[in-house]
Design a protein with these regions (language model features):
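Helix N-cap/beta->alpha junction signal
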Residues: 14, 88-89
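Conserved active-site segments centered on acidic
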Residues: 1-80, 149-154
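Hydrophobic beta-strand core positions in alpha/beta domains
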Residues: 5, 85-86
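Phosphate-binding/catalytic loops
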Residues: 83, 89-154
């Protein structure tokens, strides 16, 4: 199983999501069976590390994302990954436009896909403060935990 977590620039939500999901898969001893990566719909930050606030937030929860580097979604990702899970509706619409028609069903909003019912989107913390990063972390970590639960049922 291969999962790609997607946000806008791949420096805040999706690297935190990748880190959270990897950590939860490690806890469940599933990391050898499930590949996780992250990417952005835009290329502005390609090659950059995650935002320092995202690194600090994840580290505060025992997850190190400092070694990750931003990249843009590529056409090959639609073939390679089983699921491309988006942080928000804008990311979803962008990927649905890019995806070949037969592969569009691989693209989904991460929170509803994982069974997180309280909201659909993970708000982008980029223009906010640490409280916004913490709120985003809580959502990606909840999604990560519920993703592991979903994948262990299948």
């Amino acid at each position: 199983m291969r999962v790609l977590i997607v946000c806008l620039g791949n420096i805040c939500r999706s690297p935190m999501g990748e880190g959270a999901l990897r950590a939860r898969l490690d806890e469940a001893r599933l990391s050898r069976r499930i590949e996780v990566d992250s990417a952005g719909t835009g290329d502005w930050h390609a090659g950059d590390p995650p935002d320092p606030r995202a690194i600090r937030c994840a580290r505060g929860h025992g997850v190190d994302i400092s070694g990750l580097r931003a990249r843009q979604v590529r056409g090959a990702d639609f073939e390679h990954f089983d699921w491309l899970l988006c942080a928000d509706g804008s990311n979803l619409r962008d990927l649905q436009r890019l995806a070949p028609a037969p592969l569009r069903d691989k693209v989904a909003l991460w929170l509803p896909w994982a069974g997180v019912e309280e909201r659909d989107d993970i708000p982008d913390p980029y223009t906010g403060g640490m409280d916004d990063f913490e709120r985003a972390w809580q959502l990606v970590d909840t999604a990560a935990r519920q993703t592991v639960a979903r994948l262990t049922r299948s």
